[in-house]
Amino acid sequence: MSVIEKLIKPAHLIDMRDIIREGNPTLRAVAEEVSFPLADEDILLGEKMMQFLHNSQDPVMAEKLGLRGGVGLAAPQLDISRRIIAVLLPNPEDENGNSPQEAYALKEVMYNPKIVAHSVQDAALADGEGCLSVDRDVPGYVVRHARVTVDYFDKNGEKHRVKLKGYKAIVVQHEIDHINGIMFYDRINETDPFAIKEGMLILE
């Protein structure tokens, strides 16, 4: 049984054992574009990836399955070298602890996503970044674009263009890096990990 056949079995729930770790060559390969109309297995894989993110953000399911929380997942992290990413960004509660009107700021499975424009200004998360494929802490500012325009296709083959900024832009860039064989720590300044470039936004 191939990797993808195992992952898309109806009863299978993706867990941390399915996620490959740094050092695996798939994480350093430039992934292949998917073709349209999508094969059923590509649609099912996208659905399974989104299901994993939902489970990882659910305290009960995360504990049951032993999941680390995640907001994004790329197919290469599952040892599938295809240009598929899933992003699930919850909206925060308000200052009174009330649930947001919209549960998610971004919820999408993107096929063949591509950054088509970006800001001159850079940005980085104040607390740095982590990755489900990296089991160690790598401190430092991960320098990315503050704003990006991304083209992608959905599972029906329809093309979309989204303009993203802030945390949404950071997360999508992290996942697009995965399909290009780039790890987040490649973007940390080796000699001065917390160097701040002129005009760079630090996102709390």
Curated annotation (Swiss-Prot):
Q: What class of enzyme is it?
A: hydrolase
Would you identify the family this protein belongs to, as annotated?
Belongs to the polypeptide deformylase family.
- Look up the domain of life of the source: Bacteria
Q: Annotated Gene Ontology MF terms?
A: metal ion binding; peptide deformylase activity
Q: Which organism is it from?
A: Streptococcus gordonii (strain Challis / ATCC 35105 / BCRC 15272 / CH1 / DL1 / V288)
Return the SUPFAM superfamilies for the record: Peptide deformylase
| EC number(s) per entry | 3.5.1.88
Function (record text)? Removes the formyl group from the N-terminal Met of newly synthesized proteins. Requires at least a dipeptide for an efficient rate of reaction. N-terminal L-methionine is a prerequisite for activity but the enzyme has broad specificity at other positions.
Q: Kindly list the positions annotated as binding Fe cation.
A: C131, H174, H178
Q: What is this protein called?
A: Peptide deformylase
Q: For this protein, what does the record note about how its cofactor is bound?
A: Binds 1 Fe(2+) ion.
InterPro entries documented for this protein: Peptide_deformylase, Peptide_deformylase_sf
**So what does this thing catalyse?**
N-terminal N-formyl-L-methionyl-[peptide] + H2O = N-terminal L-methionyl-[peptide] + formate
Protein keywords: Hydrolase, Iron, Metal-binding, Protein biosynthesis
> What are the top taxonomic ranks of the organism?
Bacteria, Bacillati, Bacillota, Bacilli, Lactobacillales
Q: Which residues form the active site?
A: E175
Which PANTHER family would you find in this protein's record?
Answer: PEPTIDE DEFORMYLASE, PEPTIDE DEFORMYLASE 2
List the GO biological process terms.
Answer: co-translational protein modification; translation
